[in-house]
Each structure stands twice: as structure tokens, then as C-alpha cells.
């Protein structure tokens, strides 16, 4: 066990990034939090890099298009802001960029002339479908070290954490995640 390469890698990981902040005397939950944060940051940075290199697009634009892809009837810009957890100004800027590139369209909301409904255009749908397929391959690749049972167990454990957080946090905090 002493020469197990996975233990060497874990010891090395303890000294990287967020995890370097945790000392041996720190509570196990703090070390877990820092490992989750470090892992998430690594994955997010890699996805950002690949989206930029492969498609010339930011993660923010990808996430925006993903929300619209799920909403076949489009979304109000205020709904996009809430779902993406960004300001209305950020959504307006992204909408302007994506509309200029022909990836989204906006039209006045029938029930509220002050609101805009944003939808993916046919070009936007095709572009997002290609990106989403690549994105899924990347995520599968990044998690290739986990077998199906490990993925299911981690998914379940993180689901338990999410439920706990939703119950513990104030409604306004829980709704934004």
C-alpha cells in the first residue's frame, strides 16, 4: 500500500491550489470542501480552455445557450439572469453578442411589452448541439477514472449534500443555485 501510486497522487494533490490551504489538523469536512472546490475549478478551467480553443466561445456563452436549449419556447431575459445567477446587464451583453452572431433572436414578450423573450435561432441550435456533444465527451473523458458504481455513488452523495443545503439555507440563497 505504501507504494500505491494513487496515494502518491493524492498526497501531491493536497499541495495544489485550494487544497494547499488545508493542514493535517484541519477538520475532514474542510479538507473535503477544499478538494471539491479544487476539483471543480480544475474541470471548469479545462472546459473553459477547450470551449475557447475548439469553438472560440466563452463558458458564459455556452451556459447561456444551454439554458435556451432547455427552454424550447425561449426565456425572458430576467429568467436567464436568474438561471445563470448573473446581473441583467450581463445577460443583456451576452444577448447582444449572441444576436450579433446570429445565434439567438429576441422578440417582445406578448404579455409584457417591457420584457424580451430570447430563443436560439436555427444556427444557434445547430451550433449549440455541436458544442454540447463535444462538451459531453470532454466531461466523460475528465471522469474516466471513475467506474459506473463510483459515479453513481458520488452523484448520490452530492445529491444528499444538495438536499441538505437546500433545507439549511435561506430560501433566497437556495433558489439561486
Positions of the model-derived regions?
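Short helix-coil-helix linker/hinge
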Residues: 55-61, 90, 121, 144-147
Amino acid at each position: 500500500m505504501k507504494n500505491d501510486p494513487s496515494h502518491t497522487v493524492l498526497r501531491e494533490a493536497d499541495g495544489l491550489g485550494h487544497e494547499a490551504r488545508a493542514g493535517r489538523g484541519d477538520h475532514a469536512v474542510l479538507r473535503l470542501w477544499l478538494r471539491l472546490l479544487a476539483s471543480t475549478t480544475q474541470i471548469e478551467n479545462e472546459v473553459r480552455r477547450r470551449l475557447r480553443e475548439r469553438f472560440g466561445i466563452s463558458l458564459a456563452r455556452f451556459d447561456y445557450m444551454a439554458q435556451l436549449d432547455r427552454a424550447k419556447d425561449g426565456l425572458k431575459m430576467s429568467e436567464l439572469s436568474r438561471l445563470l445567477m448573473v446581473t441583467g446587464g450581463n445577460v443583456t451583453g451576452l444577448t447582444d453578442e449572441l444576436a450579433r452572431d446570429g445565434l439567438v433572436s429576441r422578440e417582445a414578450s406578448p404579455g409584457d411589452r417591457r420584457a424580451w423573450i430570447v430563443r436560439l435561432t436555427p444556427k444557434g441550435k445547430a451550433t449549440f448541439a455541436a458544442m454540447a456533444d463535444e462538451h459531453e465527451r470532454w466531461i466523460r473523458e475528465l471522469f474516466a477514472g471513475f467506474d459506473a458504481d463510483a459515479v453513481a455513488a458520488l452523484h448520490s452523495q452530492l445529491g444528499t449534500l444538495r438536499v441538505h443545503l437546500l433545507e439549511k439555507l435561506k430560501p433566497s440563497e437556495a433558489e439561486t443555485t
